[in-house]
Amino acid sequence: MINTVRNTVMAIINKDNNGYITPDEFNLFAKQAQLEIFEQYFYDYTNWVNKRNSRLANDGYSDIQKQISETIDSFSDQATLTYNSGAGAFPAPADSYFVNVLLYGNKEIEYVAQTKIMNLISSNLTTPNVSYPAYYTKEQFFYVYPTTIQTNVSALYVRYPVDPKWTYSVVSGSPIFNQSAGDYQDFELPQSAQNDLVFKILSYAGVNIRENDVVQFAMAGENTEQTKQS
């Protein structure tokens, strides 16, 4: 999909000799566009759930909520966490957007707000143990109790999409798409996001080359796509 998106972007930019963006600039804009759309899925999903709960959306729109949920699920991952003795905690996976569940072996570790963890520890009735562990999170670290738990902890989480990269070979002075390059990376979003990607990248490109017409075209396209999805 990334080559199709780039070809479309370049065709629109070059239509009236508006300017040019380099492959590195395209990749930078592509990364930001993918991240924006990825984060929008969570907002859209919550919005659709609220609409259904408030009976503002009928059952005919349930497929939209399902599609968004499936897209988010495609970024689900699991990782074993490595204890950091200096911090006394487990660092979150480097690519995690948010963590759904922490596990100690096969046991779910209960999340507790940091302000309440000391109350649990101070009581013999509620203090966490290896059968009923607990944790709180702070600055991308998970503090697990009892503190004797330092291994066998894993996270079920939603990861960020991998940064896209349009790779190329230079032929007669021009960059030509090279999908076989070792660092090639397509977008991880579904095909349905292609138009959104084009318009968002165009918006960044228009600002970069200082072409207001390109920015206005991109904004109009984004508004059209948002209307379709609402």
Residue ranges, per PLM feature:
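Glycine-enriched, solvent-exposed interface loops adjoining structured elements
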Residues: M1-S230
